[in-house]
């Protein structure tokens, strides 16, 4: 993805976000974006596991993302992978509230 490299060279980007949900982008699509950002030396963040357990936490960890945002449906393996990779879980309670999400993230698991 030449655009990421160009933006990095111009000093116009400090991180790249990807959104991994079945109604948004697949893990394969997000993986391409995360790899391109890493190749350009740009830190990454992932929005995932908000609406379902789509493996967003594990994907974020596998690519060394700074954060995985939302995490309402993150499973134990994803949480462990993030802990090992140093990827921080960012909880966004206002997003859950406004989307009327009834599932709450397992805060104890994510600590």
Question: What would you call each of these model-derived segments?
Answer:
Residues 1-55:
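Metal-coordinating catalytic core of metallo-dependent amide/deamination hydrolases
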Residues 43-44, 53-111:
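Active-site-adjacent C-terminal substructures of enzyme catalytic domains
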């Amino acid at each position: 993805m030449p655009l990421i490299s160009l933006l990095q060279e111009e000093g116009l980007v400090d991180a790249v976000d990807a959104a991994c949900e079945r109604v948004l982008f697949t893990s394969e699509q997000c993986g391409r974006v995360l790899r391109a950002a890493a190749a350009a030396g740009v830190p990454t963040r992932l929005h995932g596991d908000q609406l379902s357990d789509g493996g967003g936490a594990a994907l974020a960890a596998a690519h060394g993302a700074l954060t995985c945002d939302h995490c309402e449906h993150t499973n134990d393996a994803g949480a462990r992978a993030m802990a090992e990779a140093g990827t921080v879980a960012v909880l966004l309670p206002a997003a859950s509230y406004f989307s009327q999400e009834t599932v709450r993230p397992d805060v104890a698991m994510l600590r």
